[in-house]
């Protein structure tokens, strides 16, 4: 992402992506989330949508569906 964007624009771009629309997985840099919308607002929106999210190595991994997550290893 380039330049400052509003929280509404951030979420619009995130949830209008092909992966998000098809119920797949998307990633966002933690620093971008914190810069554009704030961690708390981001997590509240994902919780509202029922989308699981995990954090690893400076990335948020968002499962754009409400299916259970099973760690296999």
Give the positions of each predicted feature.
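Short, compact, well-ordered microdomains
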Residues: 40-72
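An N-terminal amphipathic alpha-helical segment
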Residues: 1-25
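Alpha-helical protein-protein interaction elements
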Residues: 2-3, 7, 34, 43, ...
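Catalytic residues for metal-mediated phosphoryl-transfer on nucleic acids/nucleotides
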Residues: 26-30
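Short, surface-exposed ligand-recognition loops at beta-strand->loop->(often short) alpha-helix junctions
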Residues: 31-37
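Residues that form generic nucleotide/phosphate-binding pockets
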Residues: 13-14, 36, 45
């Amino acid at each position: 992402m380039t330049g400052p964007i509003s929280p509404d624009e951030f979420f619009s771009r995130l949830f209008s992506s092909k992966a998000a629309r098809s119920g797949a997985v998307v990633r966002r840099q933690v620093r971008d989330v914190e810069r554009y919308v704030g961690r708390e607002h981001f997590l509240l929106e994902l919780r509202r949508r029922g989308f699981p999210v995990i954090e690893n190595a400076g990335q948020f991994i968002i499962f754009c569906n409400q299916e259970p997550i099973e760690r296999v290893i």
